Every structure is written in C-alpha cells, then in structure tokens.
C-alpha cells in the first residue's frame, strides 16, 4: 500500500511571534520543521512531501539538507496548499496519505501508526483528544453559559485518508476549512477518531515553544550527551636538564618554563576536558597569580578535571594529544606517557593517543624556542 506524508508548511505563523514563520524557527537545537520531518522518517514513512512557499528564503535554506523530499507550492489558504500537494502526489500513484501540520513537531510514532491502522477499514481517520476542561460560552467578558463537553474532541494531525477520496473531496471543496477532516466530512466521508496525545501540541503562541522544547528534550533522554573539547598550550625553553611531558620526565639539555611544572601536554589535555564541559581552562580553576601552584605537578590539574567530569556524570571516551617540537624526541617515551596519562585519568590506553610532530622548522617550535601541544577530548554522558 503506497503511503505518502503531506506536511503543510506554507503558512505565515504570525501568532507565534519572532518575526519568522514558526516552522522555520529554532527549537531544541534544530528547526521546527526538522523535528517534524524526522518524526515521520522514524515512523518509517518513506515518501514525504512538504508544501511550502517557494519564494521563502528560510524555507529554501531549511529544506536544502533534504534532497529526498518532494516539494509542492503553497497557496493563499491552507486548504489550497493541501490541494496543491495532493495534485502533485497524484503523479506518483499514492493510495494513502497522512496530512500533517508542520507546526506539530512532537508527534510520536504511536499516534501515526494508530491512524494508519484505522485506514485499513475506514476511508479517513484522525487523532483527537477528549476535551476535559469545562467549557463556557461568553459575551462582553462575562460567562453566559456552559457547554456540554461529553462529545467534544480537540483535533490533531496527522489526519489520514484514502488518497483518491480526499483528493476528490478537496477538488470539490470551495472555500476555507479548519482542517482536512472538515473537507472530508463535507464530502460525505466517515472519519474515525483515533487516540490523540497530549504532547502532540501545535505551536501557535510564543509560549508553546518552551513547552515543545521540554517535550522534545524529554524524548532525548536515551540519547547520549556527547561533548568535544579542544586544548592548546605552549611553554618556552629555559634552564634545566629535563622536560615534563604528559607526566613523564624526559631528559633534555633544557627545561620548560612555567608557573607549574610546565607539562605542556598535560595542560593541553586538561584544557580539552574543561572545554568539553564548558568549564573554562586551567587558569580559571588554578590561577597563576596564586603562589600555591608555583612549581606544582600538573597531574593535580588533570585529576581535578577528571573528577569534575565524573561528578557531572561524564565518561572520558577518548583523548588525542599532539606534541609539536623539534626536540626532544618524543617517540621513545610515547608509551610511557600514554601509560601515565591513562593511569591518572582511569581510562584504557586504547582510548588515549599521544604523538608528536614538527613544524618543519617554522615558527617558535621550529626555532627550538619551546614546545606546543594540542589535545582533543570526547566526553559522553548517558
């Protein structure tokens, strides 16, 4: 049975505020339309068409990452936009269609599937929520009466139809309609009510964005929180007979200068961990103006960053550190450095890389004036 989804996204959405149609606005790190499209992709709906304003630059930009989508031009009203989409779908031989508001990004697979199941033995089906609030009639700011709510439902989408039936209904329809169920009923189609979902809200007012974000983020609880941090550090050479690199004392004719032990590699890794947590850098936690850190072993800083990550629920997934210098030679000490860093961070050596390169005699490292280090760390919180 050939199924298509028709997402109606040609509206202006002015009541939601923000100076931009709601379907093109950001929501929980993405755009509203992204969440809506993904909801149907997750539900296994392969053919998706979006009806949009072809001249809207925000629509063009938002839909560019989806080359697999079918597109149709919107009309001056919702019903005309739907009609345009249905006519376009007619060319690909659709048997069933789900028509959905782009501004309902929180629709869940269960709601979608229940509509599809109902179409096995009825020409039209749509989700609805039984009205539970008391209903009043009113005039001039005063209550004039109450309304029986026992037979009232709040309509939702997607609204599903046998394709030929709803296409014929729209082709005969003249005028506006609240939704496609109204068009179907005017054409004499029986419409079954399937269970709605309180979270399947339609973004209409500005405050709906915060509610929708809360709903979407609650569904993301099983998605790992993955953080990436970068660290960079430099220390110049000075008097001494060794350098500290990634926790290992490496004999050398010169030392590295710094407020602490100047372990440039460990500092870069530490800053990468802080960066992944948005916790600043070493200087924020261990100010160089504080004399107690003069000459301090850098593993103090690294251990603090590791413990802070664990206190926030993060696991250190992997660390990659590159030392940039002409000398000393790092290769003979690299495994000892990996072992020491893995011990401090409590991680498997297979997830920790320490390597070295030169700058081809360019810059301060090429002139043998000091050592630079770059590090990347990935943290994961389940």
Curated annotation (Swiss-Prot):
Positions of region (2-C-methyl-D-erythritol 2,4-cyclodiphosphate synthase): 227-382
Molecular function terms, GO-annotated: 2-C-methyl-D-erythritol 2,4-cyclodiphosphate synthase activity; 2-C-methyl-D-erythritol 4-phosphate cytidylyltransferase activity; metal ion binding
Region (2-C-methyl-D-erythritol 4-phosphate cytidylyltransferase): 1-226
Residues carrying the site annotation Positions MEP for the nucleophilic attack: 149, 202
InterPro entries tied to this protein: IspD (IPR001228), IspD/F (IPR026596), IspD/TarI (IPR034683), ISPD_synthase_CS (IPR018294), MECDP_synthase (IPR003526), MECDP_synthase_CS (IPR020555), MECDP_synthase_sf (IPR036571), Nucleotide-diphossugar_trans (IPR029044)
Residues given in the record as 4-CDP-2-C-methyl-D-erythritol 2-phosphate binding sites: 233-235, 259-260, 281-283, 357-360, 364, 367
E.C. designation(s): 2.7.7.60, 4.6.1.12
PROSITE patterns in the record: ISPD (PS01295), ISPF (PS01350)
Transition state stabilizer (site feature) positions: 15, 22, 259, 358
Biological-process GO terms, alphabetical: isopentenyl diphosphate biosynthetic process, methylerythritol 4-phosphate pathway; terpenoid biosynthetic process
Catalytic activity: 2-C-methyl-D-erythritol 4-phosphate + CTP + H(+) = 4-CDP-2-C-methyl-D-erythritol + diphosphate; 4-CDP-2-C-methyl-D-erythritol 2-phosphate = 2-C-methyl-D-erythritol 2,4-cyclic diphosphate + CMP
Binding site for a divalent metal cation: 233, 235, 267
Keyword line: Isoprene biosynthesis, Lyase, Metal-binding, Multifunctional enzyme, Nucleotidyltransferase, Transferase
Source species, domain of life: Bacteria
Pathway recorded for this protein: Isoprenoid biosynthesis; isopentenyl diphosphate biosynthesis via DXP pathway; isopentenyl diphosphate from 1-deoxy-D-xylulose 5-phosphate: step 2/6; Isoprenoid biosynthesis; isopentenyl diphosphate biosynthesis via DXP pathway; isopentenyl diphosphate from 1-deoxy-D-xylulose 5-phosphate: step 4/6
Similarity section: In the N-terminal section; belongs to the IspD/TarI cytidylyltransferase family. IspD subfamily.
Listed name of the protein: Bifunctional enzyme IspD/IspF
């Amino acid at each position: 049975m050939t199924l298509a989804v028709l997402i109606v996204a040609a509206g202006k959405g002015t009541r939601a505020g923000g100076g931009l149609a709601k379907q093109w606005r950001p929501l929980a790190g993405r755009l509203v339309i992204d969440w809506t499209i993904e909801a149907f992709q997750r539900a296994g709906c392969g053919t998706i068409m979006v009806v949009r304003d072809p001249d809207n630059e925000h629509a063009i930009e938002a839909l560019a990452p989806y080359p697999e989508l079918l597109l149709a031009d919107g009309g001056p009203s919702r019903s005309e936009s739907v009609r345009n989409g249905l006519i376009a779908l007619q060319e690909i031989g659709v048997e069933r269609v789900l028509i959905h508001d782009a501004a309902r990004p929180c629709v869940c697979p269960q709601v979608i599937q229940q509509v599809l199941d109902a179409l096995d033995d009825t020409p039209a089906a749509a989700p609805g929520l039984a009205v539970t609030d008391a209903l009043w009639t009113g005039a001039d700011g005063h209550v004039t009466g109450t309304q029986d709510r026992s037979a009232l439902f709040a309509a939702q989408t997607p609204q599903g139809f046998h394709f030929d039936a709803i296409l014929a209904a729209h082709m005969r329809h003249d005028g506006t309609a609240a939704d496609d169920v109204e068009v179907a009923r005017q054409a004499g189609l029986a419409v079954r009510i399937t269970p709605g979902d309180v979270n399947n809200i339609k973004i209409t007012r500005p405050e709906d964005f915060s509610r929708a974000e809360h709903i979407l983020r609650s569904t993301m609880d099983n998605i790992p929180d993955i953080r990436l941090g970068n660290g960079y550090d430099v220390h110049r050479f000075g008097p001494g007979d060794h350098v500290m690199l990634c926790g290992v004392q490496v004999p050398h004719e010169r030392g590295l200068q710094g407020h602490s032990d100047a372990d440039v590699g460990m500092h870069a890794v530490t800053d990468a961990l802080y960066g992944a947590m948005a916790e600043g850098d070493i200087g924020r936690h261990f100010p160089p103006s504080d004399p107690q850190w003069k000459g301090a072993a850098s593993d103090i800083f690294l251990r603090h960053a590791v413990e802070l990550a664990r206190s926030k629920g993060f696991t250190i997934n992997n660390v990659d550190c590159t030392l940039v210098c002409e000398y000393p030679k790092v290769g003979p000490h690299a495994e000892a450095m990996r072992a020491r860093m893995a011990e401090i961070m409590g991680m498997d050596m297979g997830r920790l890389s320490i390597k070295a390169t030169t700058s081809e005699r360019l810059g301060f490292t090429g002139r043998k004036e000091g050592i630079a280090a770059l590090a990347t760390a990935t943290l994961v919180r389940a």
